[in-house]
Amino acid sequence: PVGIINADFLREVNLYTGAFPANRRDALSSVIEMYQVDGSKEQFNFRGAIGASDLALTADGPIGENTTYIASVRRSYLQFLFAALELPFLPKYNDYQFKVKTKLNEKNEISVVSLGAYDVNSLNLEANDTEEQRYILGNLPVNNQWSYAFGVVYKHYGENGFDTWVASRNYLDNKAYKYQDNNEVDSLLLLDYESDEIENKFRYEHTSRFDNGLKLNYGGNFEYAKFFTDNFNRTFFGGESVEFNYESSLELFKWGAFAQVSQELFKKRLVLSLGVRADANNYNEHMQNLLNQLSPRFSASFMLTQDWYLNFNTGRFYQLPAYTTLGFKNPEGVAVNKQNDLKYIRSDHFVAGLEVLPDDQSKFSIEGFYKKYDNYPFSLIDSISLASKGADFGIYGSEPVESIAEGRAYGAELLYRNRDLFGINLILSYTLVRSETKPLKESLMDLWWIPTTWDNRHLLN
């Protein structure tokens, strides 16, 4: 119900459902860019807010002549609301966020940004009157996790553009357990999961703009990641109990490069953009080759009138499977997914639509889309694509898989965005969508495409 980002920090939000910028990686369906506000240069400000689900405190102001800050903390009381509504799960969250920005001189600035959270999801065992409540209580594990992200951004402004250096570190500690019938006896243990994910990242990029309408962006990234898991999982397959009990650790070096060029033509009536990026890592031989993850993208926007635009974009995008899947080991301690030549998940996009800009603050658009997915991890335990398990309860992905599943999503979307509607940054959308996967069982091949668990048909956000 609530994201880790405090909305008070947001200056601008850009949602990309296609034509992802080449400097954004590891995304298949959409990208959200969020830009934070700076703290006040003139005075100290303090705000307290009591919402429907949490208490939030925010402060901002100057630190000396050239430095500003903004910081907030939030604590939820959502668990009391859920208990009153007799919901079977009780989420609690606590988070913090801050940004400190220093303008060194006219051409150089540095920002320090951090956010973190501690979340606990417990079960409300008294809410068990209905079949739906009992199903959730029987499947949802007790879960708690804490995380943080910390980064430093340095920018140098030149005559026609600027250079950006970004160094960051993020950490996620995740624990979950589940007992049969929620009876906490050792012999009834179904799940006891703990994992740690640590990522240390560096990115450089250069952006230039020229008087002839040309924009150029290029750069590269490097990342060192560590993953550890201690996992006990008892599941049932073919009427028999199957146990996985292992510890696993994984170290990954990731690297990538990107470039994108955009050009305005015909007195800015036509804007063309062509970009490419490539990513790789040292997990296995296939993933080490940048050319195996070559990701081109192209977009065009034509101005029909002053406020009406016709848009088109296409591209191929890649995403690394989850660490839980990359680091899985069988009871003999063998990294079977590495042996199975696990691959990056691939998605091909085709999107076209119409956009209306009534004023500088608002946008209305309608677009049709077709997105094809390949190399999705396919479970060798229950013959289900991991794409369908993401809508279910609990931990998933810690199992033997092969990169053989296919999927597709297609439909149309209506979107309205206003950056200042009575002081609110509003994004409202309705999506008519079909989400389907191709079954691999011979008995189902005559169906060809079947709905996934994400096949909601109608989405309102």
Label each PLM-derived region with a short phrase.
Residues 109-158, 163, 171-198:
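Flexible loop and strand-edge segments within Gram-negative outer membrane beta-barrel domains
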Residues 17-19, 36, 50-54, 63, ...:
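Transmembrane beta-strands of outer-membrane beta-barrel pores
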Residues 216-309, 320-321, 442:
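Signature of Gram-negative outer-membrane beta-barrel scaffolds
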Residues 43-45, 81-88, 133-140, 149-153, ...:
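Extracellular loop and loop/strand-boundary signature of outer-membrane beta-barrel proteins
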Residues 1-15, 96-98:
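Short acidic/polar hinge/loop motifs at secondary-structure boundaries
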Residues 27, 64-80, 126-132, 163-190, 228-235, 251-285, 307-350, 370-399, ...:
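Surface-exposed extracellular loop regions of Gram-negative outer-membrane beta-barrel proteins
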Residues 265, 370-372, 393-461:
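Gram-negative outer-membrane beta-barrel transporters
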